[in-house]
Curated annotation (Swiss-Prot):
Residues 29-601 are lumenal. Residues 453-585 form the Ricin B-type lectin domain. Pathway: Protein modification; protein glycosylation. This is Polypeptide N-acetylgalactosaminyltransferase-like 6. It comes from the Eukaryota. GO terms for cellular component: Golgi apparatus; Golgi membrane.
Length: 601
């Protein structure tokens, strides 16, 4: 009997140990990934654990093998670089370097571009978790397609060098440069000779000016890679940028993926993240591209994980080649540029695919100061946008026409082939897109604009003059001027109609037709200027009180003026001062009271 009890106790002990130990075997790789791979502290020599970055593979619970794709030798080599512009630091500029001639041909400071290294180093500004991520061992290769027209020599070369230096060679099937009928000599034989050193680079040239959309289509039609990756010709890809993109496509080939697009300053070439960094792509109902916060419902436990985005910014993305052509590529009826990012975004979501932004993939992009070349005559961004709206947006196109009535009578050209494609692909309607994908967009950009609190001219009581923004842009200081309705001359030069809208900001223009600039003030005593509207309140939040003062909560001050000098500025609130009293031409008291109740609650 005792022997049986002893044997029973032994078996029970073994079973208990098994219960404790065996489940944790499966957890080992998770523990190892989380705790055994450590990033260096600032100033500490980076060391890399055995098995990471040396081709060793790791099996996941889904049975797929993954590896670390980082090139640590290259990373350490870049860390040792020094010089002007290295590590993405701004180039030190003198007064002469700001001369407009440096911008004239390219829309960015070509002098700076010519004076920083073609293989300059960049800061690794990824989320820390990106440094430990593994991606599939077997990733598809890609054709990288780069259209260009009259691009600067060094900006184009820097794009290519960054790709070659920061991309695993096995993942590059080819790099296709598509020359859209450039005229500059350095982009002809000189470019051919330079690119001959790169075995995977080939140059394709158009026979006439085709525009960005058709040059991308031309490059895609000649591509051999399993994936198409589109980049602009003035970019710099960052560390380990490609594997995170290809990984998403390998997991689901009906996926379009976009990198985080960082900003390379057009003046000093400093490299930094966009304001807000990881945000969802969106649009307003005039079809301007916007970025909105990721809602809590879509935020991942790991902020470095890919997240869904309704629309892409446009120029930088990757897509499975076969899936791209199943979707019909770009609509070939779109001219030059504009609207294509909406067309491909709506199409992929409505026709059975999905789109993600990938925080662990980062690419710097020069946002030009202005477009340096002429768009061929007869082309129209408005026509492109209407063509997309009529093909994909169904009854929601009406919201665009309400804000852009001039679009109603534009010709879209023949869209029957696009309508038939949508039918063949069994695509969902735009109402589904707004409900299932872009459900958070109306919170920031409602299709039906809520009524404003006040609009029309803003007249100062003391001066009997009106606020005038003179059709200015960001940085323009507001001034007082003779009110147009009082018989001011040269009315075309004035801009005296403003809207105090539902966002509680003040914009030039009438309701439904406001411009994208807002009254902005930094602090007490600062001038009141126009600044790009950001919709995040802050410096652009205003209140219109019963004493007719325009109150600025952030600075705890009121809008004031100097009638003699016609200046407008912020000052300590004094409700008895007539220079701080402003009269809106039209007021909706119901909305205004709601604003004030919200401000006081």
């Amino acid at each position: 009997m005792k022997r049986k009890q002893k044997r029973f106790l032994q078996m029970t002990l073994l079973f208990t140990v098994a219960l404790i130990f065996l489940p944790n075997v499966g957890l080992w790789s998770l523990y190892k990934d989380k705790h055994l791979v450590k990033s260096a502290e600032p100033g500490e020599q980076q060391t890399f654990p055995l098995g990471l970055g040396d081709g060793q593979f790791y099996s996941w619970t889904d049975g797929l093998r993954r590896k670390d794709w980082h090139d640590y030798e290259s990373i350490q080599k870049e860390a040792m670089r020094s010089g002007k512009g290295e590590h993405g630091k701004p180039y030190p500029l003198t007064e002469e370097d700001h001369d407009d001639s440096a911008y004239r041909e390219n829309g960015f400071n070509i002098f700076v571009s010519n004076n920083i290294a073609l293989e300059r180093s960049l800061p690794d500004i990824r989320h820390a978790n990106c440094k430990h991520k593994m991606y599939l061992e077997r990733l598809p290769n890609t054709s990288i397609i780069i259209p260009f027209h009259n691009e600067g020599w060094t900006s184009l070369l820097r794009t290519i060098h960054s790709i070659i230096n920061r991309t695993p060679g096995s993942l590059i099937a080819e790099i296709i440069l598509v020359d859209d009928f450039s005229e500059r000599e350095h982009l002809k034989d000189k470019l051919e000779e330079y690119m001959a050193r790169f075995s995977k680079v080939r140059i394709v040239r158009t026979k006439k000016r085709e525009g960005l959309i058709r040059t991308r289509l031309l490059g895609a039609s000649m591509a051999r890679g399993e994936v198409l990756t589109f980049l602009d010709s003035h970019c710099e890809v960052n560390v380990n940028w490609l594997p995170p993109l290809l990984n998403q496509i390998a997991l689901n080939h009906k996926t379009i993926v976009c990198p985080m697009i960082d900003v390379i300053d057009h003046n000093h070439f400093g490299y930094e993240a966009q304001a807000g960094d990881a945000m969802r792509g969106a649009f307003d109902w005039e079809m301007y591209y916007k970025r909105i916060p990721i809602p809590p419902e879509l935020q991942r436990a790991d902020p470095s994980d890919p997240f869904e985005s309704p629309v892409m910014a446009g120029g930088l993305f990757a897509v499975d080649r076969k899936w791209f052509w199943e979707l019909g590529g770009y609509d070939p009826g779109l001219e030059i540029w504009g609207g294509e990012q909406y067309e491909i975004s709506f199409k992929v979501w409505m026709c059975g695919g999905e789109m993600f932004d990938v925080p662990c993939s980062r690419v710097g992009h020069i946002y030009r100061k202005y477009v340096p070349y002429k768009v061929p005559s007869g082309t129209s961004l408005a026509r492109n946008l209407k063509r997309v709206a009529e093909t994909w947006m169904d009854e929601f196109a009406e919201y665009i026409y309400q804000r852009r009535p001039e679009y109603r009578h534009l010709s879209t050209g023949d869209i029957s082939a696009q309508k038939e494609l949508r039918k063949q692909l069994k695509c969902k309607d735009f109402k589904w897109f707004m409900a299932a994908v872009a459900w958070d967009v109306p919170k920031y950009y409602p299709p039906v604009e809520p009524p404003p609190a006040a609009w029309g001219e803003i007249r100062n009581v003391a001066a009997n003059l009106c606020v005038d923004s003179k059709h200015g842009a960001t940085g323009t200081e507001l001034r007082l001027d003779i009110c147009v309705k009082d018989g001011s001359e040269r009315t075309w030069s004035h801009e005296q109609l403003f809207t105090f809208g539902w966002r509680e900001d003040i914009r030039p223009g009438e309701p439904l037709h406001t411009r994208k600039f807002c009254f902005d003030a930094i602090s007490h005593n600062s001038p009141v200027t126009l600044y790009d509207c950001h919709g995040m309140k802050g410096n652009q939040l205003w209140g219109y009180r019963k004493d007719r003062t325009l109150f600025h909560p952030v600075s705890n001050s009121c809008m004031d003026c100097n009638p003699a000098e016609k200046k407008i500025f912020m000052a300590r609130c004094d409700p008895l001062s007539e220079t701080q009293q402003w009269i809106f031409e039209h007021i909706n008291m119901t909305v205004l009271e709601k604003f004030n109740h919200h401000a006081n609650s």
